[in-house]
């Protein structure tokens, strides 16, 4: 049985949390529980080691600290499974403390698996444990190595391992937890160095948040200023902090740093865009309110970050796609008509959610190609329970070629099945 839930406004943290909590509760109530046969741990390890966990490990929405709470930035460039040893995953990445950027290489060694609580019959949940060591480049200033223990929650769906964020939005949610130390090559001194998704292990002296990670006031000066200021989304200072948080710092000298400044001219709200602090262009958003949120993600799957502006008072966004040919952002009118788009990366699709009536919600799936965005399928569902009312599939000419009333999960197209698992469940 399926439960559909959407984060329709990414800037509304409380809405996100509420929807994901409702989704989890409904799954627990409505799903058919799948228990595990009691399998010896070594047998379970053997079964699960055949999967590739590169994408589970390759999460870069990491928060970290070193020593007494100084902010630690970590980024993985590549993670891949060893061809000979299924326990080993080779890692390359970057670390940063203050302005000191280092490259590192290393390995994550998986050593055990355990089943996790099941909430849906269409996939299975597990936890893995591992050890890690990441060696920074010895020729770089202030370098050393990271070492410690690691844990991660994941799901198995259609014979593939995926990162488990079903409980994202719940108080205390965390995943991909790295807990250990950093040791200096030069002095041999060690410092606690922990990082993870959602929360940081052993961070009680730093994190005082309940619903989400929140830095205690007396440690915010330790590199957390922009992180905390970015919570003030409607202020100029908050927007400046958000631009800082969105930086691709791991690219070093090759980074393209996008920032912006708002202004109003003749009643029109505009954003001046800067690339590496040099003026690039002005985006005219029209006669709207001045409360907005910027989202720098890839909306047309071409490898470039785009510039989307959420308009608070209209609950809509305007999307400006990066044009390599023109060297600037270009308005994409397709998104103007959407109510609540979600980026479905795995399929190069955009899925939009809109209310048909009080009792019906429609999900529209558009596939992105060089020719633009094309509607390929729709779902009608009840807004407050798991009932799917209708599915339609469309051909290239926009004709409906398949229609199913009250479809079951197995009757959904493979793309809808995957979307349900990866996105409706918080992936």
Language-model-detected regions and their locations in the chain:
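Acidic, small-residue rich beta-repeat scaffolds with periodic aromatic anchors
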Residues: 168-262, 349-427
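Beta-propeller blade repeat segments, especially FG-GAP/WD-type strand-to-loop junctions
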Residues: 274-276, 315-332, 365-370
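Tryptophan-anchored aromatic micro-motifs
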Residues: 38-77, 85-95, 124-142, 172-188, ...
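Terminal domain-start segments
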Residues: 37-86, 230-294, 397-427
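Acidic/hydrophobic-patterned starts of short beta strands in beta-sheet-rich repeat architectures
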Residues: 255-259, 299-311, 349-351
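Bacterial Sec-dependent N-terminal signal peptides
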Residues: 1-40
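Beta-propeller fold detector
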Residues: 330-336, 375-380
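Beta-propeller blade termini
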Residues: 290-299, 338-349
């Amino acid at each position: 049985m399926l439960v559909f839930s959407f984060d329709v406004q990414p800037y509304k943290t409380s809405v996100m949390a509420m929807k994901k909590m409702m989704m989890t509760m409904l799954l627990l109530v409505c799903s058919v529980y799948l228990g595990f046969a009691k399998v010896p741990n070594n047998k379970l390890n053997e079964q699960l080691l055949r999967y590739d966990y590169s994408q589970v490990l390759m999460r870069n929405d990491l928060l970290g600290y070193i020593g007494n709470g100084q902010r630690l930035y970590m980024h993985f460039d590549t993670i891949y499974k060893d061809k000979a040893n299924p326990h080993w995953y080779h890692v390359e990445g970057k670390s940063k403390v203050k302005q000191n950027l280092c490259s590192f290489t290393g390995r994550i060694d998986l050593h055990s698996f355990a089943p996790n609580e099941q909430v849906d019959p269409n996939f299975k949940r597990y936890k893995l444990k591992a050890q890690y060591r990441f060696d920074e480049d010895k020729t770089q200033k202030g370098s050393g190595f990271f070492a410690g223990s690691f844990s991660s929650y994941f799901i198995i769906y259609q014979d593939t391992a995926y990162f488990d964020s079903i409980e994202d939005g719940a108080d205390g949610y965390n995943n991909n937890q790295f807990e250990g130390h950093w040791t200096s090559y030069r002095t041999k001194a060690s410092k606690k160095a922990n990082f993870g998704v959602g929360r940081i292990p052993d961070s009680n002296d730093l994190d005082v948040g309940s619903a989400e990670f929140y830095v205690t006031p007396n440690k915010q000066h330790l590199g957390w200023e922009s992180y905390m200021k970015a919570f003030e989304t409607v202020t100029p200072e908050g927007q400046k902090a958000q631009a800082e948080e969105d930086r691709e710092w791991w690219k070093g000298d090759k980074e393209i740093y996008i920032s912006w400044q708002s202004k109003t001219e003749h009643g029109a709200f505009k954003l001046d865009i800067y690339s590496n602090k040099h003026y690039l262009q002005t985006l005219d958003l029209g006669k709207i309110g001045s409360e907005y949120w910027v989202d720098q993600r890839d909306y047309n799957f071409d490898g470039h970050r785009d510039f989307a502006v959420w308009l608070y008072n209209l609950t809509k966004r305007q999307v400006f796609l990066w044009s390599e040919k023109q060297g600037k952002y270009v308005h994409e009118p397709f998104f103007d008509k959407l109510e609540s788009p979600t980026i479905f990366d795995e399929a190069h699709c955009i899925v939009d959610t809109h209310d048909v009536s009080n009792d019906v919600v429609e999900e529209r799936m558009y596939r992105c190609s060089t020719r633009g965005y094309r509607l390929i399928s729709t779902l009608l569902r009840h807004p407050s329970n798991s009932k799917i009312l209708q599915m339609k599939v469309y051909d290239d000419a926009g004709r409906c070629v398949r229609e199913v009333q009250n479809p079951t999960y197995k009757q959904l197209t493979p793309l809808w099945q995957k979307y349900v698992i990866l996105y409706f469940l918080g992936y």
